[in-house]
């Protein structure tokens, strides 16, 4: 075993030499009472230092005992236990007075609550009210988020200062940016969406005013203005009202003002109706939330007030229109016994049909039962008749002859792959009908059929011009049947006289009626119409134009309705743009024509009353002695006596 070196006693430095004992301060609180506090962090720190020193001493003792070996006596263990108990007791005695001093100090030191004066007692209620926003604020915040998405570079997010843009405050008198707009929304500075729209325009206009057109800021402002106006358009706002719940609750500026006034008046009434003996704090009253019934009552009152305001505005508009009409409109109530059967709730009526075609009961040709009434609508199937389709088996396909040119002696001469008849039948068909198509001959024949009257009409028109209508008269005379007693000699004499008259008339008026001749040529011999005035001529031209438009409309409708719809469509094809345009032109022409004539020239009085739904009261039948049941009963003898004597008597 090696020799162990003993440590010199001078090398042992107890913990007390390095750690200074904490100083104690005496605080006098409330006069005679004294409390001791150490300059350390607390009495707990001083006890910590003492525990550490005792722990080091205990370690040294253990080392000495190990060196002595197993020579210890059992009585030493008892002394060790007693010493340990005393040390523990001494530790507790040292710690106890410090803790008591701390407790006394805590009890005697006055407590100062440092509460910020700005924070109210009911902070939770105020915070809850701050979170709740009006529908207008939620709508504006939604629009602001959409607008800011159109500014990815954040050019308009914060205010512009002179440090960023020199001379900005001198050029732009009313600056605007997204942060300012958000602050105004938070402070309820906007009363309508139009105000937000104006500020947005101002922001973009300021950027376009300060920057040059070739800069990125000018281009970004122009692009943002274009996209922002689409977002703030009425169509987009209406679509948002349908898709977002709080957008549907938007009210106009006037309605919001009415709501504020109504809420103020409601608060005053509720405040006056409360018991005066109950003291209510002002702050507590401000943060109290209203009951559901109170909210519902306020909502009903608000709706009633808004309805009354809308009626008042409509009444003001009606009065203004009556004043501006210059006597054409009046508020006088007509003392009439007629009533409108088709009258709308707002007091207006419409003219159903100008010239009614539907017959009513009692009129000639009236049919009370129609096919549509008995059969009803088609529940299944297609909306068109089944078209004719030729069976493929009825189609004759002859053989096809092949021609390979020279040096093809052993090649097949015809191909019967797709033929359904024999070669002999094919030869018979080819020899009868040939191989050339007859489309050209058919087209010429169709052209001659359609235009055979045109050359004759042109020739007759030219002859009428040269003979001043004598040619047409001669044709009419020739076409009329001659009398049976007239012979061939008389016919030849009549023809000679007609020819002489035509030649004389041709020589007399050769140079005087050139304009008339041209008009006759353009009208293909039709007699020219002469009008009494220029207005009548214009009216007739308008009628002719309307007639032409109606024919074109009919042709367009026939073309659309006769077109076979695709198999995937069940309903009929809708009217085309051409039909809509023609119908609009016809309507405008008829409207202009109807304005130039009196109503009696277009339709009868009965027709107008029937179309408007005006029912005339029946005459009083008390004075009449006619029995109205005669038409529905069997014919009987009826003796009618004047009412002064007695009523009608039936025998």
UniProtKB/Swiss-Prot annotation:
Gene3D superfamilies given in the database record: Bromodomain-like
Q: Where is the composition biased (Basic and acidic residues)?
A: 70-105, 271-298
Alphabetized InterPro entries for the sequence? Bromodomain (IPR001487), Bromodomain-like_sf (IPR036427), Bromodomain_contain_prot (IPR051831), DUF3512 (IPR021900)
What compartments host this protein? Answer: Nucleus; Chromosome
The terms describing its cellular component in GO are: chromosome; nucleus
| A biological-process GO annotation | regulation of transcription by RNA polymerase II
Ranges of residues in domain Bromo:
131-235
Q: What PROSITE patterns does the record tag this protein with?
A: BROMODOMAIN_2
Q: Where is this region: Disordered?
A: 36-133, 257-298
Source superkingdom: Eukaryota
Q: Under the GO molecular function aspect, what terms does this record hold?
A: lysine-acetylated histone binding
Q: Where is this motif: Nuclear localization signal?
A: 65-96
Role of this protein: Acts both as coactivator and as corepressor. May play a role in chromatin remodeling. Participates in the Wnt signaling pathway. Transcriptional corepressor that down-regulates the expression of target genes. Binds to target promoters, leading to increased histone H3 acetylation. Coactivator for TP53-mediated activation of transcription of a set of target genes. Required for TP53-mediated cell-cycle arrest in response to oncogene activation. Inhibits cell cycle progression from G1 to S phase.
- Can you say what this protein is called? Bromodomain-containing protein 7
